[in-house]
């Protein structure tokens, strides 16, 4: 009897809760957005508009009609959202906690305007919202397309895998060509090796005529087969060149992937330092004759540009730059130079901002 009573209570409680969910309307939908200071890419109003645009906003629904998993899924479709967790209360409150992605740099090159997040996720900049991170400009062209949003690493892996698949497809196309070429060579060899033997009762004249006809046939056959084999060779050469281009493209993609990773490493180094994180506003990228990535920096202070050179010896270069800031710039003034270079090992090279007594030479400062 006790077990039956407990079971009845449980069933009634469940039915009551279900009835409540079916009648209780959503009384409030609040969105809490967690993000790093200075990186406000979205706000609560923007996310409310996002949910309404996707037809999943819970206003006017009962608790039973609210699909929390769908709400979270739609939130994650927003490129600036890293994590989303939704829940509801008995009183009709639906609440969602959202964690924003943390941008580390912003590409503004060749029609691109994209953020790169700390987790490697890439997404387009959104009107009305901005993160205070270094802006990357110059002649650097990103590997991803202008409409791309997603993981950079996954994009590279997919791109390289696609090229490897195409290389494999080219290899498969070679097999029937090799087969037909080998058949043609075998047939050509067979005809070239063929002879007509003189029988006991065959006259010399008839044998000579047969041999002459055979030679004419061999010549014509060899011409046809040689042309056929030449076509096979051209097809194979075309496929091999296609594979070579794909291998070259893979090498180029890996090189540019390395450049991108070095750029991430470089920017992360800047952002970890409270002074340089606030001082560096722009990263200008160019390319050396050897194809190496070169960097110039635009600081917030002064009217000069910092020629950083290749992304190497990062800590040493910034140490030299810090000493120069402290020992030289504070003495001569922030507008004394138009360019400060730390690309050369062990020294800081400066170009004066103003001609002095007709001298426009470089000045070396250690």
Predicted features, each with a name:
Residues 42:
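Lipid-handling modules and contact-site tethers
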Residues 1-33, 45, 51-77, 82-366:
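Charged, solvent-exposed interaction patches on well-folded alpha/beta domains
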Residues 33-39:
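Structural beta->alpha junctions
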């Amino acid at each position: 009897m006790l077990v039956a009573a407990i079971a009845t209570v449980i069933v009634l409680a469940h039915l009551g809760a279900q009835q409540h969910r079916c009648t209780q309307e959503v009384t409030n939908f609040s969105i809490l957005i967690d993000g790093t200071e200075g990186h406000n890419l979205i706000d609560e109003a923007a996310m409310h508009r996002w949910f309404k645009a996707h037809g999943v906003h819970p206003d006017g629904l009962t608790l039973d009609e609210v699909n929390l998993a769908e709400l979270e899924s739609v939130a994650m479709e927003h490129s600036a959202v890293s994590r989303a967790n939704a829940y509801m209360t008995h009183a009709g409150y639906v609440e969602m906690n959202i964690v924003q992605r943390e941008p580390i740099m912003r590409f503004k090159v060749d029609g691109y305007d994209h953020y790169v997040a700390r987790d490697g996720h890439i997404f387009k900049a959104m009107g009305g919202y901005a993160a205070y991170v270094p802006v990357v400009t110059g002649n650097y062209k990103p590997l991803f397309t202008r409409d791309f949003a997603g993981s950079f690493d996954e994009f590279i892996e997919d791109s390289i895998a696609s090229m490897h698949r195409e290389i494999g497809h080219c290899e498969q196309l070679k097999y029937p060509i090799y087969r037909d070429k080998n058949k043609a060579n075998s047939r050509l060899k067979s005809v070239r090796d063929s002879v007509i033997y003189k029988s006991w009762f065959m006259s010399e004249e008839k044998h000579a005529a047969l041999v002459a006809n055979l030679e004419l046939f061999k010549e014509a056959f060899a011409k046809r087969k040689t042309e056929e084999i030449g076509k096979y060779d051209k097809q194979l050469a075309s496929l091999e060149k296609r594979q070579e281009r794909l291998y070259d493209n893979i090498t180029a993609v890996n090189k540019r992937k390395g450049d991108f990773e070095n750029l991430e490493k470089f920017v992360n180094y800047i952002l970890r330092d409270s002074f340089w994180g606030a001082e560096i506003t722009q990263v200008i990228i160019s390319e050396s004759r050897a194809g190496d990535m070169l960097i110039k920096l635009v600081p917030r202070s002064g009217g000069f540009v910092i020629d950083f050179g290749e992304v190497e010896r990062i800590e040493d270069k910034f140490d030299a730059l810090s000493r120069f800031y402290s020992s030289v710039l504070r003495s001569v003034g922030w507008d004394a130079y138009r360019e400060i270079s730390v690309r050369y090992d062990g020294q800081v090279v400066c170009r004066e901002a103003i001609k002095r007594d007709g001298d426009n030479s470089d000045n070396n400062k250690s």
